[in-house]
Amino acid sequence: MKYIVVLGDGMADEPLAALGGKTPLEYAKTPAMDALASGGEMGMVQNVPQGMHPGSEVANLSVMGYDPKTCFTGRSPLEALSVGVKMEPDDIIFRCNVVTLTEEEPYAEKRILDHSSGEISTEEADALMEAIRQNFNDDTFQFYTGTSYRHIMVWKHGHLAKLEPPHDHLTQVIGPFLPEDPVLRGFMERSYEILNNHPVNLRRAAEGKRKANSLWYWGAGTKPSLPGFTEKTGLKGAMISAVDLLKGIAVGAGMQVYQVPGATGSLDTNWEGKAQAAIDALLKDGCDFAYIHLEAPDEMGHQGLVKEKVQSIEYLDSRVVAPICHAMEQAGEDYRILVLPDHPTPIRIRTHSSDPVPYVLYDSTRQEKKRAHYTEAEAQATGIFYPQGYVLLDKLLNK
């Protein structure tokens, strides 16, 4: 038996007038997921525990069978694991976005235009981070390039600070959301002076792209300690994701991380490559469990792009779910597959919410026969609800 999770980050949403009162998941053409729903079980699951911020780190830990309330030490330390950062117990790790701020006002009066700087390429971002390193790196502060707009700062023997995610405050004046810590705030203000007229940003502006003109700190935490996935489940696990956060969780859990060329975490990602990596992990490399994480629905939700969010869901269905299921069937391999979001990223608010999300669980050896569509409404109508998301993995593993 092979076990598969396909995670559409932020895929759940609310009914939208632009879609005739349907959610993006309802509006999208998803024959593969509908087939799973027709032959399997649907329900709702609460991946974000009450009182915790609805971040992808918390929600994905839940989906992977970890209770965030007992094992979560911050988002950034998990991301740091994926880029090989060595951490000491008293180090503080920060996520360090390169963001787009307005240019006319004093720093505290600027607004956040884009938390992702137009989904800047990793190559461009690395050039900007090198300028940051040249100005800021020393024995106390170290900066590491991640993927696209997502980077890491380590503050040796530092202290935790209250910080706000930039994607929660798009278009808003930043003053009320800046760090109270004078060191962090000073770095952010100075970063604007370094980055705004950097050659990379001047070229991006000339091409009509958004500048990545400031650092933004958030998601601080300390060195993580996760129970090993194999020790916990008895299974050899594989992670396929473009996002450092998920790769870091996998590293911390002792799972095999697959690097997929062209995996960007956006609509232009290598969908087929990610599906093939999962197929290879399960059918060639001896893995029992594959976790395929698709970031695009979340990014489209943050950007408020309705058509593109629908498209991302259709791509997930036709270019990931369908080929994986087909490959398992062609190989004569019994499998159980769980498809779900980690959290909603509603177009209306352009950030995460803590609401329950719909799941579909299919077992190739126990097919039911009914007509169903994988949607929020139909999943809710089943009356099945898991209030603690981390127990759903045991359901997938039939424990």
Write out the residue ranges for each language-model feature.
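Feature captures the catalytic ectodomains and active-site-proximal regions of enzymes
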Residues: 1-399
